[in-house]
Amino acid sequence: KHNVDLKLELAWTIVPFILIVWLTYYSWGPINEVWASPDDPDSMYGLECGTEGHDPNKCYHTIGITAQQWFWSFDCNGLDADICDSSEYQDLNGTMVPVLKLKQGEYFYANLSSEDVTHAPWFVKFGVKEDAVPGLHSALWIAPTCETANCGGDEGESTLLLCTEYCGDDHAYMAAIVNVHNN
């Protein structure tokens, strides 16, 4: 049988191909920043704050996030409490969960670890998620932002940190509160 729809078939092949190439090119920049090396001074995050040669307007802080069934724990690595604080707990639907307080406008490099099974911390409002696998080093860049101009006033703005990888019976209750403030 003779193929009379060659132009249509070529269009069905070429147009999606061009679209995929364009989307790949367009998204390469943001993906590259998500996995930027903490040792790259040319990345948007700069060098670690407090290291020699860092730019105070372009630097990041290192924090630790540990997952275990069915709880999050945070380590602010001795940072000032106005930049990072993890000493409080709050009631969330009848469950006491940890509160991570972060300062707006700062960058955080979070070293992720898991003590038991695979977990996946998801910072809901920040749009970032990464797997925490036992025995495997993984990290996540966090740039806390506020949706309102005054960042929630004295209380700050809160968002949730949820686990998106099924990790057992109480997976649905594995949450933390992330509070972003600008004072």
Task: Spell out what each predicted region is.
Residues 1-183:
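Non-transmembrane, membrane-proximal soluble domains of secreted or membrane proteins
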